[in-house]
UniProtKB/Swiss-Prot annotation:
PANTHER family: LARGE RIBOSOMAL SUBUNIT PROTEIN BL19M (PTHR15680:SF9), RIBOSOMAL PROTEIN L19 (PTHR15680). PROSITE patterns: RIBOSOMAL_L19. It comes from Thermosynechococcus vestitus (strain NIES-2133 / IAM M-273 / BP-1). It holds the Pfam family Ribosomal_L19. This is Large ribosomal subunit protein bL19. The gene is rplS. GO terms for cellular component: cytosolic large ribosomal subunit.
Length: 120
């Protein structure tokens, strides 16, 4: 057993199996665990998936939303223990793998058309 096999076996133990199918363009709600003092709570973060990286345990999504007129992007490690839940709210119809052009658009120009042929 070489080093690569050992790394893969450790990563396989820590990977989550209950993740939904997520595509670029989807509107998602991510529940993030926040620790404040000795209490822990779940903070929802809702936005559009503008980028994805699919590399095993390092799988990430970049979620963008506009809050008080300012665009905010967060990158979430999907297999992180700090991620409590991920729920797909709406499927989006896009023709690109990365939606970085949405950074330059504001208001109605940054909307993504809904897609109805994929189940939630």
């Amino acid at each position: 057993m070489n080093a690569q096999d050992i790394i893969r076996s450790i990563e396989a133990e820590q990977m989550k199996t209950d993740l939904p199918v997520i595509y670029v363009g989807d509107r998602v709600r991510v529940g993030v665990k926040i620790k404040e003092g000795d209490k822990e709570r779940v903070q929802p973060y809702e936005g559009d998936v503008i980028a994805m990286r699919n590399t095993g345990i390092n799988r990430t999504i970049t979620v963008r939303r506009v809050f008080q007129g300012v665009g905010v992007e967060r990158v979430f490690l999907l297999h992180s223990p700090r991620i409590d839940s991920i729920k797909v709210i709406q499927r989006g119809k896009v023709r690109r793998a990365k939606l970085y052009y949405l950074r330059d658009r504001m208001g109605k120009a940054s909307r993504i058309k809904p897609r109805f042929d994929r189940p939630l």
